Amino acid sequence: MVAFSDKQEGLVNGAYEAFKADIPKYSVVFYTTILEKAPAAKNLFSFLANGVDATNPKLTGHAEKLFGLVRDSAAQLRASGGVVADAALGAVHSQKAVNDAQFVVVKEALVKTLKEAVGDKWSDELGTAVELAYDELAAAIKKAY
């Protein structure tokens, strides 16, 4: 079990709301960061076949879903100290053979994107809360393989 406070959940929720304020812009930041760090990741996302396009609803929809899952992870951590991922989510990641290094790249892109979204409201405490929520989500997805 992981201790996750109301304050940490609030920080993650606030970062998610900042992301939602301009989903197309921050989706581009997110996927551009992923592709800069791991160009082969382009093959994992069918909607990246023609590059990072802010007008692509699949790109923005997937980013919104992922960032929402991190927010939901924070809520689960605060409520129960653990995260449970949907079995279908585990199956998709297993089918795509997503490995630990790829989860790390996504976490780095998530943090960079949220840091840009919240601007001067970024803090070490917010970064720690986001990383913990993401790490527990990633662990739950791997467990659901």
UniProtKB/Swiss-Prot annotation:
One of its GO terms (biological process) is nodulation. Residues 3-145 form the Globin domain. Transmembrane segments: none annotated. The modification Nitrated tyrosine is found at Y26, Y31, Y134. PROSITE patterns: GLOBIN, PLANT_GLOBIN. Keywords: Cytoplasm, Heme, Iron, Metal-binding, Nitration, Nitrogen fixation, Nodulation, Nucleus, Oxygen transport, Phosphoprotein, Transport. The modification Phosphoserine is found at S46. One of its GO terms (molecular function) is heme binding. The keyword Heme applies. GO terms for cellular component: cytosol; nucleus. Heme b binds at S46, K65, H93, K96. The keyword Membrane does not apply. Nitrated in effective nodules and particularly in hypoxic conditions; this mechanism may play a protective role in the symbiosis by buffering toxic peroxynitrite NO(2)(-). Nitration level decrease during nodule senescence. Root nodules. O2 binds at H62. Belongs to the plant globin family. Monomer. Leghemoglobin that reversibly binds oxygen O(2) through a pentacoordinated heme iron. In root nodules, facilitates the diffusion of oxygen to the bacteroids while preventing the bacterial nitrogenase from being inactivated by buffering dioxygen, nitric oxide and carbon monoxide, and promoting the formation of reactive oxygen species (ROS, e.g. H(2)O(2)). This role is essential for symbiotic nitrogen fixation (SNF). This is Leghemoglobin-2. It comes from Vigna unguiculata. The lineage of its organism: Eukaryota, Viridiplantae, Streptophyta, Embryophyta, Tracheophyta. The gene is LBII.
